[in-house]
Design a protein with these regions (language model features):
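Hydrophobic anchor at the start of a short beta-strand
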Residues: 124, 188, 223
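Active-site flanking residues adjacent to catalytic metal/cofactor-binding acidic residues
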Residues: 105-107, 191, 226
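Active-site segments of SGNH/GDSL-like serine hydrolases
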Residues: 155, 159, 177-208, 232-235
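Catalytic His-Asp segment of secreted/periplasmic serine-dependent ester chemistry enzymes
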Residues: 2-7, 12-18, 45, 67-70, ...
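N-terminal secretory targeting modules
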Residues: 1-101, 237
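Charged helix-capping and loop-helix junction motifs
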Residues: 167-176, 206-211
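Conserved SGNH/GDSL esterase-like catalytic core that processes O-acyl groups on lipids
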Residues: 64-172, 199-202
Length: 268
């Protein structure tokens, strides 16, 4: 792929268009290529925001505005993520769904799955929330009870690992979830945590150890464990075919995931 000399991305939607036109390229490679053009260094998407931050802190752009800007942007992003999280939890707690048979429970990898399209004839709901970890899922698991599902499909752990939580502490919280669902006559179906792509590869040894321990726990508790990694992240890494950003999944990956869990989406 080449980018024309002098081409400037004016907004985030143009970034989306660039990715759509070059769907074999990773997002990171496209951005690296774009910013390798000298003309674009002064025209990055957030440049005007950087100037605003500079003015707020009475700094020149030649000063430490970059650090200040990144700090301010981090606060804004965190606030936005928390706002979305709180709003979604509030909806799950207060906007009641009819009773269902199956619940998909997890973080963004679950949240962004097109489950209704993949299983149009199944009575299921999506209870994934982007950015969540096992602490948040423990807090949220109670809002699944009113749905009276037969089974809950769980994927969790990658955000905990990336946030530095120990495998032991994550598994302890995971076990609390499993015990909670079993005590309430809901069958938990555990899905392996997926490996990540090359840019996040430092997490993969932890994912491997985590999954091995999780599988042992499921065996002891007589809980179904579905190893998604065999198909979705073989060779202990998430291939570019299955992810554009080394973490979240492509449509083809969700289709493969759906086929792997289809045998469990039935009434026993």
């Amino acid at each position: 792929m080449t980018i024309k000399k002098g081409y400037v991305i004016e907004n985030e939607f143009e970034l989306y268009e660039m990715c759509a036109l070059n769907n074999s390229e990773s997002v990171f490679d496209l951005l690296a290529l774009y910013f390798s053009n000298e003309e674009n260094i002064k025209n990055k998407i957030l440049f005007n925001q950087a100037k605003t931050v500079a003015n707020d802190f009475n700094l020149s752009l030649e000063h430490d505005v970059i650090v200040k800007f990144c700090n301010a942007l981090s606060v804004l992003q965190t606030a936005n993520a928390m706002s979305q999280y709180i709003t979604k939890v509030d909806s799950h707690n207060n906007i009641r769904s009819e009773p269902v048979d199956f619940v998909m429970f997890g973080d963004s990898i679950t949240d962004w799955g097109p489950w209704y399209e993949l299983f149009p004839k199944k009575k299921l709901v999506n209870r994934g929330i982007a950015g969540d970890n096992t602490q948040g899922m423990l807090y949220r698991m109670g809002n699944i009870l009113p749905l009276n599902p037969k089974k809950v499909f769980i994927m969790a752990g990658i955000n905990d690992l990336s946030q530095g939580f120990s495998i032991k502490s994550i598994l302890k919280r995971y076990c609390k979830m499993l015990d909670f669902f079993q005590m309430n006559n809901i069958e938990p179906i555990v899905q392996s945590t997926l490996f990540v792509g090359k840019r996040l590869a430092a997490l993969n040894p932890l994912v491997l150890e985590f999954n091995q321990n999780l599988q042992d726990i499921c065996k002891d508790k007589k809980i179904s464990y579905i190893d998604l990694t065999i198909v979705l992240s073989p060779n202990n890494t998430l291939p570019s075919e299955h992810s554009r950003d080394n973490l979240h999944l492509t449509a083809i990956a969700y289709q493969k995931w759906a086929e792997l869990i289809r045998p469990w989406l039935r009434h026993d």
